[in-house]
From Swiss-Prot:
EC category name: hydrolase
Protein location: Cytoplasm
Source organism (scientific name): Prochlorococcus marinus (strain NATL2A)
Protein name as catalogued: Urease subunit beta
Entry's family note: Belongs to the urease beta subunit family.
UniProt lineage: Bacteria, Bacillati, Cyanobacteriota, Cyanophyceae, Synechococcales
Length: 106
C-alpha cells in the first residue's frame, strides 16, 4: 500500500521542455552599477534596473527564458547573454516600474 504525503508531487518520467516553440531573443546585458542586480523569471525585462545596459527596444514585452520562480543575478561589472521570450496571453503589462501599464496589443 502506498501512502500519499500532503502536497507531494509525483511527476511523470521524462523532461518538461520550457517555452517549447516560442520565439527567443538573445541580448548582451552588462551590469554597469556598483551593486548586484537580480531579475526574476517573469519580470518585464524592458523595465529592469537602469544599471543594466542592453538594447531595451528588443526587450519590450519579453521576460527571461528561465524556469518559473528562478532568477538571474548580475554582479557589478558582469556581462553575459540572456534569452528572452515574449509574454503570452492578453499581453497586458501593468506594474513593474510603471513604464507601460497598458496592453501591448495596441
Amino acid at each position: 500500500m502506498s501512502y500519499l504525503i500532503p502536497g507531494e508531487l509525483i511527476p511523470e518520467d521524462g523532461f518538461i521542455e520550457l517555452n517549447k516553440g516560442r520565439e527567443t531573443t538573445t541580448l548582451k546585458v552588462a551590469n554597469t552599477s556598483d551593486r548586484p542586480i537580480q531579475i526574476g523569471s517573469h519580470y518585464h525585462f524592458f523595465e529592469s534596473n537602469k544599471g543594466l545596459e542592453f538594447d531595451r527596444k528588443k526587450s519590450l514585452g519579453k521576460r527571461l527564458d528561465i524556469p518559473a520562480g528562478t532568477a538571474i543575478r548580475f554582479e557589478p561589472g558582469d556581462q553575459r547573454e540572456v534569452n528572452l521570450v515574449p509574454y503570452a496571453g492578453d499581453r497586458k503589462i501593468f506594474g513593474f516600474n510603471g513604464l507601460i501599464n497598458n496592453s501591448l496589443q495596441q
